[in-house]
Design a protein with these regions (language model features):
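A short alpha/beta connector and helix-capping loop motif
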Residues: 23-25, 40-68, 73-75
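Short acidic, Gly/Ser-rich segments with clustered Asp/Glu that frequently serve as metal-coordination loops
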Residues: 33-39
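Short glycine/proline- and charge-enriched loop/turn segments
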Residues: 42-49, 93-101
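Active-site-adjacent betaalpha module
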Residues: 19-26, 36, 62-71, 88, ...
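N-terminal nucleotide-binding beta1-loop-alpha1 segment
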Residues: 28-31
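Short beta-strand segments at enzyme active-site cores
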Residues: 73-80, 182
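Sec-dependent N-terminal signal peptides
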Residues: 4-14
Length: 219
C-alpha cells in the first residue's frame, strides 16, 4: 500500500512539474499570415526563393500548433496589420518603413493580413496588437502579456527568419526571456540566409531546435 501511495505521489509530482514547465513556455507565431503562407500571398511570390523550405515550414507550423493545442501550451499570434495609408510608419524613407507601403502589404482590411487558415487563432488564444516594427515587441502588448502570464521560455516560429524572427529573438533576449527558434518552422528567402542566421546569429541570443526536438522535449 505504501509503495502504491509513493508511486502515485511521484507520478503526481512529475505531472505537476511538467505542467509548471509548460506553463512557463509559449509559442510566438510571427506573421503566420497569408502574405507569407498562402500561395497567392504577395511576399511569398515576391521574396521566397526556396519553395521547398517554405512548404516544410508551413507543415511544421501546422504540427506545432496542433501539438500545442493538445498539450495546453500557449499560442501567441503576432502578426502585422496597418491602417490604410500606413500612418503607423510615418512616411518612412528607408528599410521596412519604406518597403511595406511600397509593396502594399499587411493592410488591415486586406487578404494578405489575415491569418493563414490552418493556423489561425481560435478562442482563448492571444493575438498581439499594436505591433509596428520588425520585432514582435515593437509598439505591441507582447511583453506585458508574457510577463503577466509568467512566461519565461519563448519559442519562435514564422517569417521571415532573417528579418522579423531574428529581430524578435534579439529583443526577447534583451528583455531576459529564454528564447528559441524552431528552425524548420521558419523560413528565410533562401537557404543561405536561413543557415547564416541559425549558424552565426542565434547562439548569441538563444538556441535553435527542430520541430521534432521541440515536440519530444514537451511530451
Amino acid at each position: 500500500m505504501k509503495r502504491i501511495t509513493l508511486t502515485l505521489m511521484i507520478f503526481l509530482m512529475v505531472n505537476l512539474l511538467q505542467a509548471q514547465v509548460q506553463g512557463k513556455s509559449a509559442i510566438v507565431l510571427i506573421e503566420t499570415q497569408n502574405e507569407w503562407m498562402h500561395k497567392d500571398g504577395k511576399l511569398r511570390k515576391l521574396l521566397i526563393q526556396d519553395e521547398t523550405m517554405m512548404l516544410k515550414s508551413i507543415q511544421n507550423i501546422e504540427k506545432i500548433v496542433d501539438f500545442a493545442r493538445k498539450n495546453n501550451i500557449p499560442l501567441i499570434h503576432c502578426g502585422l496589420r496597418f491602417d490604410k495609408g500606413y500612418p503607423e510608419l510615418a512616411n518612412g524613407k528607408s528599410g521596412l518603413r519604406k518597403a511595406i507601403p511600397k509593396a502594399g502589404t499587411f493592410l488591415k482590411e486586406g487578404f494578405g493580413s489575415q491569418f493563414y487558415e490552418s493556423v489561425k487563432p481560435i478562442e482563448g488564444e492571444f493575438i498581439v496588437t499594436g505591433r509596428v516594427g520588425a520585432s514582435g515587441f515593437t509598439g505591441s502588448n507582447l511583453d506585458i502579456y508574457l510577463r503577466n502570464n509568467n512566461i519565461e521560455n519563448v519559442y519562435l516560429v514564422g517569417y521571415a527568419t532573417q528579418v522579423c524572427v531574428e529581430s524578435t529573438l534579439r529583443d526577447a533576449h534583451e528583455k531576459s526571456y529564454n528564447t528559441f527558434i524552431i528552425s524548420d518552422a521558419t523560413s528565410a528567402f533562401n537557404k543561405m540566409q536561413q543557415e547564416y542566421v541559425l549558424n552565426e546569429i542565434v547562439h548569441h541570443f538563444g538556441e535553435h531546435l527542430t520541430t521534432k526536438e521541440f515536440i519530444n522535449q514537451k511530451k
